[in-house]
Amino acid sequence: MAAAFSSDGEAVLRRTLDPAAAAPRGDKDEFYEVDRAAAFVRDGGFRKVALQFPDALLADAAAVAARMEEVTGAEMYVLGDTTYGSCCVDEVAAEHVSAGAVVHYGPACLSPCRKLPVLHVFGRQPLDVGRCAEVFRELYPERQSRVVVLSDVVYAHAMGELEKQLCHEYPNIIFSEVVCGDAPSPTLPGEVRQFGRRFHMEAAEELQDCSMFYVGAEGLALTSFMLTWNRFPFSSFDPATGHGRRETLNVNRALMRRLYLVERARDAHVVGILVGTLGVAGYLDVLEHLHQLVRRAGKRSYTLSVGKPNPAKLANFLEVDIFVLVACAQNSLLDSSEFYRPIVTPYELELACNPAREWTGNYLTDFRDLLPGACAHIELPPAVPAAEAIPDVSLITGEMRATHLCDPLAPQPPSSTTLACRDQTRALAEMSPAATFLESRSWRGLEQQLGKTAVSKAVQGRRGIAIAYEDEGREQS
């Protein structure tokens, strides 16, 4: 899972793309929906359009761009390797070429964008509908079963035909619909809209009795579905292999791992906020929200933008106790087992720092749900004086820790700490995470050794560049 979002630069350089394997079979105009994309460009009056391709479809980029320029007369720019996840629209790269719109090809997380108009062309991957229906009947022999059918976006085009084959046999089957863009809030009772999918239930309580059937390969999308709807049994059909199965992912074990990371976040003193997207709408709002949350919790935060995170990059920030990744819903669940410090989601940081938010069994991966006015937003409770705070003990270290919130309007502590106040437990109230980290290091830098080191005059140093200093040339001659 880590390789889907974080990547090593050497791995990218060594990767070999096979054009024959990457190129889809059949008519390219139909696969890439050239007519629909051309209508989008003409109707919008765009003169410059960015075409974003994932690595798997990059072999066809030149042909598709030439075809689009031929039918629209607009100037096309191909966007290849994206700064973050390929499922997200790379608005930053599109703005570099002054593009008026983006056509995003391939799998997508369907996160709404901030600025540019976007058209999603998923690519019509082939699906054996007959085989899929046969597998569905094997997995659900009871004809009265309540099943919600979800699919990867690349197979959404075939869901209508699958529905025709199954709706007469299964009267309680429900097919989800792919929704692109930032759709308005649900207005119909019983409507569920999440992960860019929408389906309708006759009654809200009916969802508790449903099973989920996913059409697509194993990946981040399926993992997000299973963690979010963790109370429902999942089955899947992989079109590449033609086999179906009941998903055996131990959701409880995965959730226990995530809750362990919440406990690590409670113990952290320094939080690194990783910017994992620059195009998803609301990312600036959630960054500000996380800054306020961390500050109210008495922790220190730093905002880091390192592109695609990998262990080597994040290992440079030793002072950071835990990272929180602000990314789209699919890329938020980054496996941090290979990293030196844990990586949590904004929802997990809220569980750790907001006393008013409790674990209810519902897991959230979309950070926009946490913002004011959203469905899952919970206000921070009033600040509690340190003397009245209930002490808490870490379940990991066994040490005492502070869990009360600080007053957001309280003035910053003075720079001088000659006089420090003590609370009722006679403990010092001020603590510096930086000083604590420095004290724990085995090597703290060069010591001055005042009065012990002889004073020497400045001498002439070496000249040149590291590859060939001037004195090295004289020595060789």
Swiss-Prot record:
Q: How is the cofactor bound?
A: Binds 1 [4Fe-4S] cluster per subunit. The cluster facilitates the reduction of the catalytic iron-sulfur cluster in the DPH1 subunit.
Involved pathway(s): Protein modification; peptidyl-diphthamide biosynthesis
A Pfam family name for this chain?
Diphthamide_syn
What keywords tag this UniProt record? Iron, Iron-sulfur, Metal-binding
Per its Swiss-Prot or TrEMBL entry, what cofactor is needed? [4Fe-4S] cluster
Show the GO cellular component annotation of the record.
2-(3-amino-3-carboxypropyl)histidine synthase complex
The molecular function terms in GO held by this entry are: 2-(3-amino-3-carboxypropyl)histidine synthase activity; 4 iron, 4 sulfur cluster binding; metal ion binding
Which InterPro entries does this entry report, sorted A to Z?
Answer: DHP2 (IPR010014), DPH1/DPH2 (IPR016435), DPH1/DPH2_1 (IPR042263), DPH1/DPH2_3 (IPR042265)
Biological process (GO), any one: protein histidyl modification to diphthamide
Positions annotated to bind [4Fe-4S] cluster: 88, 109, 328
Among its keywords, does the record have Metal-binding?
A: yes
Report if keyword Chloroplast is assigned: no
The record's function comment reads: Required for the first step of diphthamide biosynthesis, a post-translational modification of histidine which occurs in elongation factor 2. DPH1 and DPH2 transfer a 3-amino-3-carboxypropyl (ACP) group from S-adenosyl-L-methionine (SAM) to a histidine residue, the reaction is assisted by a reduction system comprising DPH3 and a NADH-dependent reductase. Facilitates the reduction of the catalytic iron-sulfur cluster found in the DPH1 subunit.
Give the NCBIfam families listed for this entry.
Answer: diphth2_R, DPH2
The annotated subunit structure for this chain is:
Component of the 2-(3-amino-3-carboxypropyl)histidine synthase complex composed of DPH1, DPH2, DPH3 and a NADH-dependent reductase.
- UniProt family annotation: Belongs to the DPH1/DPH2 family. DPH2 subfamily.
What is this protein called in UniProt? Answer: 2-(3-amino-3-carboxypropyl)histidine synthase subunit 2
What organism is listed for this UniProt entry? Gallus gallus (Chicken)
